[in-house]
């Protein structure tokens, strides 16, 4: 089977191009909801069951989401189910979000810290990152990982900046030849 990102890209592009700028946020919200459902083992089992038609699966999933699906998203869901690509929906949602952010001049930022970041420390970090990335609007996701010991690990797109104590210790160990 081809790489999931390769399979997902045309679906994400098609949905992105069919949505108007004002519809992007709503489509993304519904797509993320469908991605969560598609990741459930029970839903995966249904999608692989030859007795369950693509239309039935689409109706079932449409009924499981919180709000009525936008017609574009409903059509997208039918297409995905007809092509037996429900497994790719989480990756499609990820790529759709990246396209939305790019069109809005924004970037997702994953920040992992050894300790909770709050208040002025978080604001200072985001301010520095905003300057570093050309004034883009940053949409942070913050996680705490005590194994970092100290410092932060920041990922924006493909770029990773790791100033954690864990990485510094590993670099010292490598340089000492231990």
Swiss-Prot record:
Organism: Polynucleobacter necessarius subsp. necessarius (strain STIR1)
Function: F(1)F(0) ATP synthase produces ATP from ADP in the presence of a proton or sodium gradient. F-type ATPases consist of two structural domains, F(1) containing the extramembraneous catalytic core and F(0) containing the membrane proton channel, linked together by a central stalk and a peripheral stalk. During catalysis, ATP synthesis in the catalytic domain of F(1) is coupled via a rotary mechanism of the central stalk subunits to proton translocation.
Pfam families linked: OSCP
This protein's GO CC annotations: plasma membrane; proton-transporting ATP synthase complex
Protein location: Cell inner membrane
Quaternary context: F-type ATPases have 2 components, F(1) - the catalytic core - and F(0) - the membrane proton channel. F(1) has five subunits: alpha(3), beta(3), gamma(1), delta(1), epsilon(1). F(0) has three main subunits: a(1), b(2) and c(10-14). The alpha and beta chains form an alternating ring which encloses part of the gamma chain. F(1) is attached to F(0) by a central stalk formed by the gamma and epsilon chains, while a peripheral stalk is formed by the delta and b chains.
Annotated keywords: ATP synthesis, Cell inner membrane, Cell membrane, CF(1), Hydrogen ion transport, Ion transport, Membrane, Transport
Top-level taxon of origin: Bacteria
Family recorded in the similarity comment: Belongs to the ATPase delta chain family.
Topology term for the membrane: Peripheral membrane protein
Gene3D superfamilies per UniProt: N-terminal domain of the delta subunit of the F1F0-ATP synthase
InterPro entries on file: ATP_synth_OSCP/delta_N_sf (IPR026015), ATPase_OSCP/dsu (IPR000711)
Keyword Transport (UniProt): yes
UniProt GO molecular function: proton-transporting ATP synthase activity, rotational mechanism
Keyword Cell membrane annotated: yes
Official protein name in the record: ATP synthase subunit delta
UniProt main location, coarse: membrane
């Amino acid at each position: 089977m081809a790489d999931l990102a390769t399979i997902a890209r045309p679906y994400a592009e098609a949905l992105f191009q069919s949505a108007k700028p004002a519809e992007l946020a709503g489509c993304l919200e519904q797509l993320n909801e469908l991605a969560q459902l598609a990741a459930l083992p029970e839903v995966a089992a249904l999608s692989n069951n030859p007795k369950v038609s693509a239309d039935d699966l689409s109706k079932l999933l449409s009924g499981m989401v919180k709000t009525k699906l936008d017609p574009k998203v409903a059509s997208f869901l039918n297409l995905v189910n007809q092509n037996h690509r429900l497994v790719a929906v989480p990756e499609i949602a990820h790529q759709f979000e990246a396209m939305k952010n790019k069109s809005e001049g924004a970037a997702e930022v994953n920040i992992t810290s050894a300790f909770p970041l709050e208040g002025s420390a978080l604001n200072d970090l985001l301010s520095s990152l905003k300057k570093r990335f050309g004034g883009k609007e940053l949409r942070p996701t913050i996680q705490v990982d005590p194994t970092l010991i100290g410092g932060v690990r920041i990922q924006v797109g493909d770029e990773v900046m790791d100033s954690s104590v864990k990485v510094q210790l590993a670099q010292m160990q490598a340089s000492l030849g231990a």
